[in-house]
């Protein structure tokens, strides 16, 4: 039987021989931002490969292993070609690659609005303060809630956002308890998103957006309900959108 540590080692294996100064990228493309308070805006996405988490409802498993090497200069050049003022660094888990910190610095130096979407399991300390962080707090039904790095809450800025992906009423109740325990509604913008479109053959629990909307209304919590806009515009299984 594979131990938890060897499982993580296996997940990180694609990065083992990555040259210093290079990023293992999965895809770079322009689309409509589908989440966060930036939803609806044109955005360039830099999706880095490899993730150490395995959320049961993950909609980007294709980024676990597949990637190509690119220098920071190459990535910067490709982003700038789109002439789009908004860029998001996502994954995978982007903070697994140390070069991402310099990439974000250089993107911000060019005057771009830089978003970072991260699982919340890794230290946010080195992130450039100009970057807008969108951090997950993993709910129990994700299978990854034990990896939440609670110390990151003290590293977030008031302009950063915390996202909860909700797959059940139990997840929602956990979210409300967590918000209250850490006074999050007074500190950050909070996003709650339903798992309503899972990958084929996924065993993830799902809920309808209307269910989550009703729970949110009944709770009185000032969180923002979000539905992944890109999945309403295009096929939920489509890539590069």
Regions found by a protein language model. Name each.
Residues 95-241:
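Conserved AdoMet/S-adenosylmethionine-binding subsite of the radical SAM
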Residues 1-49, 53-57, 218-224, 233:
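Flexible, acidic/Gly-rich N-terminal and inter-domain linker regions that tether
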Residues 33, 76-80, 180:
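Generic structural signal for well-ordered alpha-helical scaffold segments
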Residues 47-49, 75-76, 147-148:
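Short hydrophobic/aromatic-rich motifs at helix boundaries and adjacent loops
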Residues 30-37, 60, 129-135, 166:
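Short, mixed-charge, low-aromatic patches
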Residues 3, 7, 25, 37, ...:
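Residue-identity detector for threonine
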Residues 10-11, 20-23, 27, 42-45, ...:
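Conserved Radical SAM active-site core
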Residues 30, 36, 87-88, 240:
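Short glycine- and Lys/Arg-enriched binding-loop motifs that mark or flank ligand-binding interfaces
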């Amino acid at each position: 039987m594979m131990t938890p540590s060897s499982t993580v080692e296996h997940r990180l294996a694609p990065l083992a021989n990555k040259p210093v100064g290079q990023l293992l990228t999965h895809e770079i493309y322009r689309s409509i931002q589908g989440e966060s308070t930036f939803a609806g805006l044109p955005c360039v996405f830099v999706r880095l490969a490899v993730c150490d988490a395995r959320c049961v409802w993950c909609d980007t498993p294709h980024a676990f292993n597949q990637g190509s090497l690119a220098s920071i200069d190459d990535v910067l050049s490709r982003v700038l070609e789109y002439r789009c003022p908004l860029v998001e660094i996502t994954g995978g888990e982007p903070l697994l690659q140390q070069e991402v910190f310099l990439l974000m610095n250089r993107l911000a130096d060019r005057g771009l609005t830089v978003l970072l979407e991260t699982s919340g399991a890794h230290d946010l300390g080195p992130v450039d303060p100009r970057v807008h962080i969108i951090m997950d707090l993993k709910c129990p039904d994700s299978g990854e809630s034990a990896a939440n790095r609670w110390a990151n809450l003290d590293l977030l800025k008031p302009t950063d956002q915390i996202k909860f992906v909700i797959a059940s009423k139990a997840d929602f109740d956990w979210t409300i308890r967590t918000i209250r325990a850490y006074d999050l509604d007074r500190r950050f913008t909070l996003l709650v998103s339903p798992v309503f479109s899972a990958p084929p053959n996924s065993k993830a629990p799902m809920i309808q957006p209307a269910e989550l909307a009703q729970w949110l209304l009944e709770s009185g919590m000032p969180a923002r309900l979000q539905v992944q806009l890109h999945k309403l515009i295009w096929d939920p299984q489509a890539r590069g959108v």
